Regions:
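Beta-propeller domain segments
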Residues: 17-50, 155, 173-176, 186, ...
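Short loop/turn segments immediately following the C-termini of beta-strands
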Residues: 73, 81-82, 122-124, 130, ...
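Residue position within the beta-strands of beta-propeller blades
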Residues: 77-79, 119, 168-170, 221-224, ...
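A short beta-strand motif characteristic of beta-propeller blades
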Residues: 56-59, 96-101, 141-147, 196-201, ...
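Positively charged, low-complexity/disordered segments
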Residues: 346-352
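Beta-rich catalytic cores
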Residues: 54, 64, 83, 96, ...
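Residue-level detector of Asp-centered blade-edge/turn motifs that repeat once per structural unit
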Residues: 70-73, 112-114, 160-164, 214-217, ...
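Asp-box/WD-like beta-propeller blade repeats and closely related beta-sheet repeat scaffolds
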Residues: 97, 101, 106, 111-113, ...
Length: 352
């Protein structure tokens, strides 16, 4: 049996496409507000997993847990993304926990760089010296200020390249659709580890949440939540490698050169240059983070591929998401729809 340890997870069938899909016209179906409601976990509720796999709960009882990072000694760090949020350290197979950091402004992304733990808050990126043995953190040092960028999409993914030369940060847009955001919103930014040398690495990314380098590669990947209010099947979320200098559509186009009617006639140059993402996901499924699998416990077809977490829709007539899906890779490229997923009945749980 293959064991999946689930700390935060969860429902619905998803189909990822690795070629440009046939998209419906905008407003082919009505814009629908259909949010799920958090309910208590039913007594008999359990995650549904592919044949041959089992699932066990690692830890529970968090306040809006949004991100996990494994430490060098096997500890697991978890961010609680509330107004005065925390970074927790879990040890002893999730049975023991302590607050590493507290009183943070909606902490989200985490990353290691040498002796430092980097933490993304809504308006700031800070680094803390981390004591590996004691599992404690020193005083925070702000390396990047994002003051004023806490409106709209405030979560920030963090990633370092393999050599540790650059820090990459995702910065979402200020709204679902707006023209006139600062040029460094809806982007992936690049800095030196000390916060100097700011550069815009890629643009047109409405809400890039997950941010990681592929194994044995200098290729950065991101998971992106796309815009709303075009109907059930527009605009698809996506999962893609990111080209330096690339433009990915927002707010003028989407999924390649499909012009957004709300920006009709504007920036045809950008519309025409919009990159089609590697993997197109269902619209409004709310993809969050992802992780590449490099272990040996699962069958060979899982190695090198990516697990994606889908939080679930809030504006589709038929709800979608609530699952953890897997996209297989071969030679560093995605090869097809997911081959397995962990899911549960909608609204019982929400993966992050």
């Amino acid at each position: 049996m293959f064991k999946i340890t689930v700390a935060l997870a969860a429902a619905c069938t998803l189909c990822a496409q690795v070629k440009s899909p046939d998209l419906p016209a905008p407003f082919a179906t009505p814009d629908t507000a259909n949010p799920g409601k958090m309910v208590a976990k039913p007594e008999a509720a359990k995650l549904i997993v592919p044949a041959g796999f089992t699932v066990e709960e690692y830890a529970a009882g968090f306040q809006k847990p949004r991100y996990m990072l494994q430490g060098v000694s096997g500890e697991v760090l978890v961010t609680e993304s509330i107004a005065k949020g925390n970074v927790l350290v879990l040890t002893d197979s999730g049975k023991t926990r302590k607050k590493l950091l507290e009183g943070l402004d909606r902490p989200y992304g985490l990353a290691w760089h040498k002796e430092y733990l980097y933490v993304a808050e809504a308006t700031s990126i800070k680094r803390y010296k981390y004591d590996v043995k004691a599992m404690t953190a020193g005083t925070g040092e702000e390396v990047v200020s994002l003051k004023g960028y806490d409106k709209g999409h405030w979560t920030h993914g963090l990633a370092f390249d393999a050599k540790g030369e650059y820090l990459y940060i995702s910065v979402g847009s200020s709204a679902d659709h707006v023209i006139g955001d600062p040029e460094d919103r809806a982007t992936i930014l690049r800095f030196h580890p000390d916060g100097s040398g700011k550069a815009i690495y890629a643009t047109g990314l409405r809400n890039a949440i997950g941010l990681k380098f592929a194994p044995k590669s200098n290729e950065i990947w991101t998971s992106v939540q796309e815009r709303d209010h075009f109907g059930d099947d527009l605009v698809p979320d996506f999962f893609t490698s990111v080209r330096q200098g690339g433009f990915y559509g927002w707010p003028y186009a989407y999924i390649g050169p499909h012009a957004d009617p709300r920006a009709a006639g504007q920036r045809k140059d950008l519309v025409d240059s919009t990159i089609t993402p590697d993997v197109v996901l269902p619209a409004h499924a709310a993809v969050l983070d992802f992780t590449f699998y490099n272990g040996k416990a699962f069958p060979a077809e899982y190695r090198g591929g990516a697990f994606l977490a889908f939080h679930g829709s809030s504006n589709r007539s038929k709800r979608l998401g609530y699952s953890v899906a897997f996209v297989p890779f071969k030679n560093g490229k995605p090869t097809g729809p997911e081959i397995g997923r962990a899911s549960c009945r909608e609204r019982v749980c929400y993966p992050v």
